[in-house]
């Protein structure tokens, strides 16, 4: 695919190849998802690590030494594994509260009137088979039918679920992006030998669609030598070199490389082989961390992913999902959905950063952040609202309930909090807190006309959907499917 590809060349000397033929190709050819396959003894349902964590790293290309433990070799589940009862595959948490169910579960209440379910176990104790998110390799390459989806008994919920199943990112889509990442990393390491390239954003966080772009983060130095890059000077210089490399050496494989000098500068390009559009940034480390935070939320409750996808499609259709044009970024929209689900009378989602601070600490080294989802048990809400009611409630919340003038959306706190007084928050129409660095992810909405357009669309769509109970009233489903 790329000039310097070494596909098929054995990466290790004979003394490093040991007894296992799993790694017979260059380690950079395998995805970080596939490398993590070796981490678990799946056959015995023993999720203890079979590879030293110091050597097995997300996005790392170092040789991996295996133990004598049996390895998961990328096979499909055996038939007897597929037929295990649900309780044997995963355990869920039930609320300890005995209060009667709240009738109107789609209208958020103030913080003190909401119920939240604490974890059944202390955060430092996670039983081997108790977790909400399968290991990294299990999710990324699972066939869609193996992911349990919510039931849909009413028309609106069925429409949402059908749109999700049609438009969600497929395994083949992810593999294309991962292959490009692997081989681009090899090329970029000619310029920066210590660098690593991470696939981030919707491609990995569980909220991707078939048409989702690929987001890449170039980390120019590995930990513990990691350093902060000035995005206005050093990042632009690094990306200028990368852009030049793409134009001169990879013009046959990459088309339309373009250096965008934004607050966080990027190189935009299109991979001719996969036809995927990519955005590449430098050392935007928070993007790596929030990818795995969102990934955990995505698989924490089976209504989250379908709801997020249909809302992203709705926002895109109404032209309020484009930060480059002064509206909401997809990341902000996802945080808005998560916030809504956290603020219901019976929350559907908790604050993961509050319950599991050690799993989502900004101090975690980058090569370990992918393990966070494996430490989080399932979360079962008492809220039984269907997808249709949740979509309607989401629109109503931001059309009539949320105070845009004085409140900030905080997934970290699982509630709306007062706006800070800092300069970044002044004269901003929408405030959405980034869960790790505390910046405003909705800062692109800086014109009143665009803000009014966003609010107006929430209100109009809420009224239409409430009256029709048909997804086509706010989003032409056929057109959304064609775009995918």
UniProtKB/Swiss-Prot annotation:
GO biological process: hematopoietic progenitor cell differentiation; histone mRNA catabolic process; mRNA 3'-end processing; negative regulation of miRNA catabolic process; RNA 3'-end processing; target-directed miRNA degradation
InterPro entries: MTPAP-like_central, NT_sf, PAP_assoc
Function as written in the Swiss-Prot or TrEMBL entry: Cytoplasmic poly(A) RNA polymerase that adds successive AMP monomers to the 3'-end of specific RNAs, forming a poly(A) tail. In contrast to the canonical nuclear poly(A) RNA polymerase, it only adds poly(A) to selected cytoplasmic mRNAs. Does not play a role in replication-dependent histone mRNA degradation. Adds a single nucleotide to the 3' end of specific miRNAs, monoadenylation stabilizes and prolongs the activity of some but not all miRNAs.
Binding partners and assembly: Interacts with CPEB1, CPEB2, CPSF1 and PABPC1. Interacts with QKI isoform QKI7; promoting recruitment to miRNA miR-122 and miR-122 stabilization.
EC code: 2.7.7.19
Gene name, Swiss-Prot/TrEMBL: TENT2
Binding site for Mg(2+): 213, 215
Distribution of this protein across tissues and organs: Expressed in brain. Within brain, it is expressed in cerebellum, hippocampus and medulla.
Principal subcellular localisation of the protein: cytoplasm
Any single GO CC term annotated in Swiss-Prot or TrEMBL for this entry: cytoplasm
Molecular function in Gene Ontology: ATP binding; metal ion binding; poly(A) RNA polymerase activity
Boundaries of every PAP-associated domain copy: 386-440
Catalytic reaction(s) noted: RNA(n) + ATP = RNA(n)-3'-adenine ribonucleotide + diphosphate
Designated name of the protein: Poly(A) RNA polymerase GLD2
One Pfam family this sequence matches: MTPAP-like_central
Region (Disordered) residue spans: 72-97
Phosphoserine: modified positions: 62, 69, 95
Motif (Nuclear localization signal): 76-92
Basic and acidic residues bias locations: 77-90
Sorted UniProt keywords: ATP-binding, Cytoplasm, Magnesium, Manganese, Metal-binding, mRNA processing, Nucleotide-binding, Nucleus, Phosphoprotein, Transferase
Cofactor(s) needed by this chain: Mg(2+); Mn(2+)
Location within or outside the cell: Cytoplasm; Nucleus
